[in-house]
From Swiss-Prot:
<dbReference type="InterPro" id="IPR050995">
    <property type="entry name" value="WD-F-box_domain-protein"/>
</dbReference>
<keyword id="KW-0677">Repeat</keyword>
<keyword id="KW-0282">Flagellum</keyword>
<comment type="subunit">
    <text>Inter-microtubule bridges in flagella.</text>
</comment>
<dbReference type="InterPro" id="IPR019775">
    <property type="entry name" value="WD40_repeat_CS"/>
</dbReference>
<dbReference type="InterPro" id="IPR001680">
    <property type="entry name" value="WD40_rpt"/>
</dbReference>
<dbReference type="InterPro" id="IPR036322">
    <property type="entry name" value="WD40_repeat_dom_sf"/>
</dbReference>
<dbReference type="GO" id="GO:0031514">
    <property type="term" value="C:motile cilium"/>
</dbReference>
<dbReference type="InterPro" id="IPR015943">
    <property type="entry name" value="WD40/YVTN_repeat-like_dom_sf"/>
</dbReference>
<feature type="repeat" description="WD 4">
    <location>
        <begin position="450"/>
        <end position="480"/>
    </location>
</feature>
<dbReference type="Pfam" id="PF00400">
    <property type="entry name" value="WD40"/>
</dbReference>
<feature type="repeat" description="WD 5">
    <location>
        <begin position="492"/>
        <end position="522"/>
    </location>
</feature>
<keyword id="KW-0853">WD repeat</keyword>
<feature type="repeat" description="WD 6">
    <location>
        <begin position="534"/>
        <end position="564"/>
    </location>
</feature>
<feature type="repeat" description="WD 2">
    <location>
        <begin position="366"/>
        <end position="396"/>
    </location>
</feature>
<feature type="region of interest" description="Disordered">
    <location>
        <begin position="229"/>
        <end position="250"/>
    </location>
</feature>
<keyword id="KW-0969">Cilium</keyword>
Length: 606
């Protein structure tokens, strides 16, 4: 370092003796202008070669923008870091003095980088430490999983043992059930036999009751004849003629009943009734020998002077539900004097039940299609039914069979009704006609024509020969059954009329239609009295209570709705049916109400 300083001083001292060469500026510019691009490139290449020779080979790897490149640490930096890390400060100073001296004198080769193996070892140590931690965590998880698996295995063994025990109990129960079935099968014939005996006894009981009523009526008639001041010759007449002469209305009904039950039908004196050509032009066959007469003197309504309290419909609730049919129950009929109900069903049968217990008395099978109409004889000794097979059948309870079948209708029959004398049955059909059947003659008395659509329902005015019909042509007509003439037609419904019914006095007529509208008509003034809207669902059938102040309506929404006939106010709404209610009836004694519906049931409300 001292020698270098002396040389510098000597150069500075000799600056004044240095001879400078004059350089022309213009000549320098000419030299610059003479250089071309190739010379510049050659010089640049030479300079680059010298730099590469001085610093070592340069990396030619291009680095993409955004890419991070890790450059290895040079050897001297590595050693410094090592000395400092280990606390060898004096060693580090000696190393730096010797390192920089060798570098200044040019005796030191180009510095190299630290081999990557050290860095790789450090990274691997970190990875090993991480893997050891993960291994410890995995061992912990495996331990917990093993404990859970042991728990599940124990539970599996427990449930497997429990399942085996349940299977053994099941097999034991199946064995016991099989034994019970075999044991029950031994008693089944006995049960069937007892059931048949029970049904036979119930039928015999009913027959005896009917026979008792007939004998009581005959005894009363004979007592009246015996007490009346009649000649002896007239007293010696037969029981049937005596009852007709001295028994009044009951005697006439009894005589008609006896003829119908015993089958003592006089031969017909002529052909069937002539068909009508219009509502006002129907032609009656007229009274003939062997035919029932509807021209008897008018009978006074026995209820005209009686007053009954209104049915307590607000207090009614569902008492019992009976499911005695396989299909929809379409109609109902109550016995005139006994607590007996008949139901007509789509399963081609009618069934008789004792109310209010619901015990089955008998079942009528014979129709080839559904049964829609049923009605009791006024004396309660026989039953009329009609249905989809276009037949009207008369069933005798004493003989326990069908005694007469009328097949003049061309299409299905919707309704059948007995006249109050019991010798004539009216039927309404899908063939647009109403036919009157003469039971003594066993033939069709006349056909009432005039409706232009199906006759859905009909009702006799109590103790008269007037017949009301409801039709799908939106009209309600009243017919004189003696002359076969239409005496009155009521207009006002906007849809098919489904049902018609009279009150007990015959002074008021109710009609229902498919719009849910119920209209009340005064039969004396032949005018509409009130209109009741039951809702958007069709109203099927209606029935007055014995006071005439309450009207029950069977609706398609599964409800029975009771209205006041004076102001049309809803008094009660009986909900219980699961489908449409088809028919409804009040008990003649005013104790309960019966309804039937498309849910295959009939229900008792009390």
């Amino acid at each position: 370092m001292a020698a270098a300083g002396l040389d510098t001083l000597r150069l500075e001292d000799s600056d004044d003796d240095f001879k400078y060469e004059e350089v022309d500026v213009m000549s320098d510019g000419e030299d610059d202008a003479s250089e071309d691009l190739d010379a510049a490139l050659r010089k640049l290449q030479q300079f680059t070669s010298k730099q590469e020779a001085a610093t070592g080979p340069a990396r030619t790897t291009e680095v993409k923008p955004g890419q991070v490149v890790k450059k290895p640490e040079v050897i001297d930096d590595f050693l410094r870091n090592f000395f400092i890390k280990m606390g060898l400060s004096r060693t580090c100073e000696c190393f730096e003095a010797e390192w920089y001296e060798l570098k200044a004198t040019g005796r030191l080769d180009n510095s190299t980088t630290v081999p990557d193996v050290y860095l790789r070892n450090a990274e691997l140590e970190d990875d090993v430490a991480g893997l050891r931690r993960e291994l410890a965590e995995a061992k912990s998880i495996a331990g917990r999983a093993s404990a859970t698996w042991d728990k599940f295995r124990k539970e599996r063994d427990f449930h497997r043992m429990h399942h085996k025990r349940v299977a053994q109990e099941k097999n034991k129960l199946l064995t016991d059930l099989r034994r019970l079935k075999e044991h029950y099968a031994k008693y089944e014939p006995t049960i069937l036999e007892l059931k048949k005996k029970y049904e036979t006894l119930m039928k015999e009981k009913m027959m005896m009751s009917l026979e008792r009523d007939k004998l009581a009526a005959r005894v009363d008639a004979l007592e009246q004849v015996a007490s009346s001041p009649l000649p002896g010759a007239e007293r010696s007449l037969g029981g049937q003629s005596t009852a007709a002469a001295g028994g009044g209305a009951s005697g006439r009904a009894l005589g008609a009943t006896n003829r119908a039950l015993t089958g003592d039908v006089p031969p017909a004196a002529g052909a069937a009734a002539a068909a009508a050509t219009g509502r006002s032009g129907a032609v009656s066959a007229g009274p003939r020998s062997g035919w029932a007469s509807l021209n008897a003197p008018p009978r006074r309504n026995p209820y005209a002077d009686l007053e009954f309290p209104a049915a307590p419909v607000k207090m009614l609730s569902l008492n019992k539900t009976f499911k005695g049919h396989l299909l929809s129950v379409a109609n109902l009929a109550l016995h005139p004097t006994k607590p007996i109900l008949v139901t007509a069903s789509d399963d081609k049968t009618w069934k008789m039940w004792h109310m209010p217990g619901g015990d089955l008395i008998m079942c009528g099978e014979g129709h080839k299609d559904w049964v829609a109409g049923v009605d009791f004889h006024p004396a309660g000794t026989c039953l009329a039914s009609g249905g989809g097979d276009s037949a009207v059948k008369i069933w005798d309870f004493e003989k326990q069979r069908c005694v007469t079948t009328f097949t003049d209708h061309k299409q299905a029959i919707w309704s059948v009704r007995f006249h109050h004398l019991g010798e004539v049955v009216a039927s309404g059909s899908l063939d647009h006609t109403v036919r009157l059947w003469d039971l003594p003659a066993g033939k069709c008395r006349m056909a009432l024509r005039g409706h232009v659509d199906s006759v859905n329902d009909l009702a006799w005015q109590p103790f008269s020969s007037s017949l009301a019909t409801a039709s799908s042509d939106k009209t309600v007509s009243v017919w004189d059954a003696r002359a076969g003439l239409c005496t009155q037609t009521y207009y006002g419904h906007q849809n098919s009329c489904n049902g018609v019914s009279f009150n007990i006095l015959g002074t008021q007529l109710a009609s229902t239609d498919a719009d849910g509208v119920v209209k009340l008509w005064d039969t004396r003034m032949t005018a509409e009295v009130a209109t009741i809207n039951t809702g958007k669902h069709p109203a099927n059938k209606s029935c007055f209570d014995r006071s005439g102040q309450v009207l029950a309506v069977a609706c398609d929404d599964g409800k029975v709705k009771a209205y006041s006939t004076t102001d049309g106010v809803l008094q009660a709404e009986l909900a219980g049916h699961e489908d449409a209610v088809q028919a409804v009836l009040f008990d003649p004694a005013g104790q309960y109400l019966v309804s039937c519906g498309s849910d295959n049931t009939f229900r008792l409300w009390s």
